[in-house]
Amino acid sequence: MQATAVVETASNKGYNNNGRNIQKDEPSHHKKENLLSPNGCKEAKLTFLNDYYDSLALEKRANDKEISNIDKIDLLEPSFTMSPDTNIESAHSQSSEFEDNIDYAFLNETYTIHYSESKLKSESLIHLNSELDSEMQKREEVFFDILEHQGDKITDLERIYKISYDDYKKTAEDVQKPDIDEDSQQEYHSAEEQECINNHLSFDQAKTLDIPNLEVLGLRNSGCEVKCVSNLEDSHVKLESNSSISLDSVDVYGQEDSPSVSKLQNSVTLRAFHEPKYEKCKEQGTSLMLHTVLDEIILRSSHLEHKESESKGFLNPQKALKTKIYTHKVNPQLTESKDSIGNVIVEDKMLQHLDNPGTLPQDKHLETLLQPCKDCQTSSVFDDSVISASGYSHYESLQSTPNPALDVSITLPRSAIRGNQAVEESGSLKVANGNTISKAHFHNMEGPCPKSETDAAGCTVTVDQTVDVSTDFRACFTASRATSARSSVVSTSSNTEITMMNKKRPSEWQSEKQRSVACNTDWSYIQDTEDPQMAMTKGPTGKSLSVDNLKPNGNVLNKDSLELKTFEFTDLKKHSESMLQIQVEKNLPSKCCQQIMQRAIQAESHLLNVHYQLCHRHCSDIYRLVMEDREGLNRNLSSNSTRKELGSALLSVLGDLKVRYMNLKEKINKGIPLEELPPLSIESRLLSAFSTFASRLMKEESHIFSGADSELDNQSTRDVGSSSLKKTLSQTSLLLDNGHPKQDKSPEEGGLKNGDINVDLSQLKLDDKDCKNYREVSEDWFDAKENLTGADFSGIQENQIEQDKGDPKFTLAEIKNVEPLRKDKGYLMHVGGLCPSVSEADLRSYFQKYEISDISIYDSSPNYRYASLAFKKNSDAKMAVKEMNGIEIKGKSVNVRLVKTPGEYTPLSSKNGNKVSFSNLEKSTSKEMSSPSSVSRLPRTRPRQPGSEQDSEFFPFDQKGVKKNCKQIESTKLLPDTPIQFIPPKTLNLRSFTKIIKRLAELHPEVSRHRDHIIDALQEVRVNHKGFLNGLSINTIVEMTSSVLENSASS
């Protein structure tokens, strides 16, 4: 294996290439270097005087020195040359032993480095002596002094060293451990072992490297070790721009010479290459330990000026960079962490503590140095290389100085290696993704260093090159734009990994991705915020493309030459601001959704409040209507206790309404939609006086009621508490129009097809003059809404219209007395217009030839009395109505009317005996509604005739209250000469009652033929629920009625 280096010297120095030795023109410094080569590894030690370096570092030599010649010297066998005018030129030469394993050492298109040989004198180590000072035999120092490039003048390194392969091999064999086998390269060290190894380490004052331009030195050898001993107290290392350093395996460490000299031992592992033909390396299995002084390097961006050198043919980005090296005290620590992939294990055994950093100026225009700021977070785009390697590590954060030209801060990655392990710290943004570290084990090849007689302190730089025992990893090296350039770490075998064990993983590494080296991934930290130009170098799958497919235009790292060039950085600060804006925009939809949700909640709350106000006003209106009617109030609510009970009932209903309202409002505020909540309703617990009062109002307004009308009227007034009063009055007004058809018809037996007869009303009353106009009307059970049709009142006699005002109404006592008659299934007959002196015995004497089961007399008012007679047979009732209507009892004629009981489906007979079914009823009603004579006449202010015969159903009332509160009743009052067809809503929607009857008939087939039993059960359920079925579901009504039927059947 051959390793060649091209070295460029100043014009005042000359060197001769003599095979394996390099002879200088000065005879006093002509020395031959020995090379250590364990397993094909070479070690080269380069030394420079501190004094000479100081003289180079403290003055500008951009205009004082010129390049006189470029010597090309082989380190081993025949060498190759690289011309500065070409980007990449390589000449391959082979040696007798390593014929197929030639590695190329390329510098960045601008500079070449020549090594001159010098021989070490102690313990198998090659000590390279500088030609300017003989006192360097005690201590070996290497200073890579890359002079600043101004314009077209370039000053390179001033020393050329040649490394002898044979001597290097002998020295390496002395150090080689014979008991190391092939597997010893894959070695894990525990925390205790590393702690014992590293306890003697300490760190001294940091040295500052002021770098005018971004540079990286690149060496490509299979085995090379460079050791340096120096203590840079007043020295700088000036790196020229656009030069690159890429070492396969580098170990630079400082050895402790005296108490004042600090020892810097960190391990940085760079990429190592191995040819498959290295049989000797496979047998010996030597594992080398690499150490480096590079502890913490921070490159600061300065003014950049781009110039091209026509003679050199390279790109000068001219980025003025400032670098500080801080030495720390290291205590070995051991932690272990694995990512989810499980391919990479990183072991870190170092604690770094920044202590007394030293800062030295290099140039006048670069005298301003960034001072360390402890425990300070900066606002720079870069995270200022703040990485904590363990729980006790402490790093100082330096704020990056943005470049005025590019407005970007450039930070060079830091390499800190400790205890045979490698850690690379990136000085870029967050260390986020794509960190590849391979496990490698290296042996420390430290040797005694001769003491120097000079006053200058020394620093030892050792470069070890490790041989890969498995394969040649010549993979693509891509450089991340986020961190400029950094060295890569390659495992010594395809299956080995470096284990970094941190007691506390740095916060920057928490989101990193680690990939295997075999996947051709670099050790760059892929940032969350990627450069737009860098994104172009990635394929569609997000992986880095091979640099073979990219042109070497200065923006990529070539795979063959390993020549790393500088990148042009975009304004990451602006990019981060744009990312913040994007993040804010992403949060906008959630805020909009929250606002929309809030508005929806407010709208539903407002709607609920409106519903609550309607219900509240409904109850208040009912109470006000009752209290305003003085006559009805005095008659029905005679006692103060009854009035108090009325008020307490109203307050109770309003209190329950408010509680339900607050509960619903709270649920809406919690986000429950209003449509998923039960509706806000009122459960009426009003007194019977409400029903009596509302019934009286409706009867007074209609003037004429049939028996069916009166029955439906009582039902609708009972349901006032659960539906609005206006709605009930409107339905009642519609009922009035249906009461008296023109033709004399009577229903057939079983003619009520749909079961739509009203089964829950108190009584049906037939006027003696209106028996021929009788018609049955139905009610919707579930909604307690009367779907009735209009009727013609043209056949009403004038005397009845005049008498309607004075007819009294049923009282609550009458309704209660009728209940036992229902159970007896008797036929009721209404006798109205009785004089006050008529008694029950008088009525029995008049109706004694008819089988009367019961007689009841009611006093609605002092001027109006009526009686209800119950007959056992229908024929007797019909005969009594026919014969007794209009007779005088004690000097006063009475009106006799037949009333069908609620529990009887048997049709009632009229005078002429004609029959009509319910279906015919609807048809005839529709025909009559279309006729002009179907308009009802409802006089508003017709004066009452005190001495006239009055129908027993009516009594006077306050007309103003009706006009004020019953607008829907007035809407049905039309002019006599204006014919109009009135069609009430839901005329044909009578399904609720039919459903109930049908389901009960299916559940109880034994009583399905006798529907009166089902009706009786429904009435009993209604009575048990205080006379209200409104609000109950059909299923609930069916279940309750079914239970009543079962109990009656069992009894």
Curated annotation (Swiss-Prot):
The modification Phosphoserine is found at residues 385, 388, 546, 716, 722. GO terms for molecular function: protein homodimerization activity; RNA binding. Transmembrane segments: none annotated. Residues 1-37, 533-552, 731-756, 903-957 are annotated as: Disordered. Residues 827-901 form the RRM domain. Residues 1-21, 907-923 have a biased composition (Polar residues). The keyword RNA-binding applies. Residues 739-751 have a biased composition (Basic and acidic residues). It is found in: Cytoplasm. Residues 927-936 have a biased composition (Low complexity). InterPro entries: Nucleotide-bd_a/b_plait_sf (IPR012677), RBD_domain_sf (IPR035979), RRM_dom (IPR000504). One of its GO terms (cellular component) is catalytic step 2 spliceosome. GO terms for biological process: mRNA splicing, via spliceosome. Its main location: cytoplasm. Keywords: Cytoplasm, Phosphoprotein, RNA-binding. Component of intercellular bridges during meiosis. Intercellular bridges are evolutionarily conserved structures that connect differentiating germ cells. Not required for fertility. PANTHER family: HOMOLOGOUS TO DROSOPHILA SQD (SQUID) PROTEIN, RNA-BINDING PROTEIN 44. Homodimer. Interacts with TEX14. This is RNA-binding protein 44. It comes from Bos taurus (Bovine). The gene is RBM44.
